[in-house]
């Protein structure tokens, strides 16, 4: 029987173990037993907390999105200008918590399996919409709404593409280079546009 008060800790350990296990294998073809072993708990306890693999996988993805949203909100609160807001959005998407090798591999796996899972597809769409709307909010203070939408679409595609590129490579993810690439793209797209920022 699990100890009282241990559930949040055990759930987090299992979610972290799921990220590592999925990332190491590059597939959702993992078992609750494998995830539980990685977490150092029994499969029965994992089933007790999550009720099965599908719910554990969804909880893992929700956790990643929650962390991303929390970090993004904190970073945006520190931004005083549209340019600072854009920089904060890009930096958070390539933060150490998100742009780590196993987490990148887990994200790529989620994208692949979105073709078979409506729940995963829905969560990825939520992520994409939030990224897009956050970028547009800042960009439309610097250019037209139509152009802001196009730039945000391109920046989102670059972020996803950099995750895919790093997931397929053996090198340690280089967040600084990734951030610079996306920032350069946005700067080039905005060049020559009348700025609303003083």
Swiss-Prot record:
The keyword Chaperone does not apply. Residues 8-68 form the HTH tetR-type domain. InterPro entries: BetI_C, DNA-bd_HTH_TetR-type_CS, Homeodomain-like_sf, HTH-type_TetR-like_transc_reg, HTH_TetR, Tet_transcr_reg_TetR-rel_C_sf, Tscrpt_rep_BetI. Keywords: DNA-binding, Repressor, Transcription, Transcription regulation. PROSITE patterns: HTH_TETR_1, HTH_TETR_2. Residues 31-50 bind DNA. GO terms for biological process: glycine betaine biosynthetic process from choline; negative regulation of DNA-templated transcription. Pfam families: TetR_C_6 (PF13977), TetR_N (PF00440). The keyword DNA-binding applies. Pathway: Amine and polyamine biosynthesis; betaine biosynthesis via choline pathway [regulation]. GO terms for molecular function: DNA-binding transcription factor activity; transcription cis-regulatory region binding. SUPFAM superfamilies: Homeodomain-like, Tetracyclin repressor-like, C-terminal domain. HAMAP family: HTH_type_BetI. Repressor involved in the biosynthesis of the osmoprotectant glycine betaine. It represses transcription of the choline transporter BetT and the genes of BetAB involved in the synthesis of glycine betaine. This is HTH-type transcriptional regulator BetI. It comes from Brucella suis (strain ATCC 23445 / NCTC 10510). The gene is betI.
């Amino acid at each position: 029987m699990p100890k009282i008060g241990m559930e949040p800790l055990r759930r987090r350990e299992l979610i972290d173990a799921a990220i590592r296990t999925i990332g190491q294998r590059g597939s959702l073809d993992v078992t609750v037993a494998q995830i539980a072993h990685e977490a150092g708990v029994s499969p029965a306890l994992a089933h007790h907390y999550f009720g099965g693999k599908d719910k554990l996988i969804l909880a893992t993805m929700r956790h990643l999105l929650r962390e991303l949203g929390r970090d993004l909100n904190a970073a945006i609160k520190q931004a005083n200008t549209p340019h600072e807001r854009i920089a904060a959005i890009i930096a958070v998407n390539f933060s150490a918590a998100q742009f780590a090798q196993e987490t990148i591999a887990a994200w790529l796996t989620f994208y692949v399996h979105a073709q078979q899972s409506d729940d995963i597809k829905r969560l990825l769409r939520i992520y994409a919409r939030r990224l897009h709307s956050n970028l547009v909010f800042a960009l439309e203070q610097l250019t037209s709404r139509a152009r802001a939408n196009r730039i945000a679409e391109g920046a989102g595609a670059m972020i996803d593409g950099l995750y895919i590129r790093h997931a397929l490579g053996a090198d340690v993810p280089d967040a600084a280079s990734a951030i610079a690439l996306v920032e350069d793209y946005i700067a080039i797209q905005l060049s020559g546009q009348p700025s609303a920022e003083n």
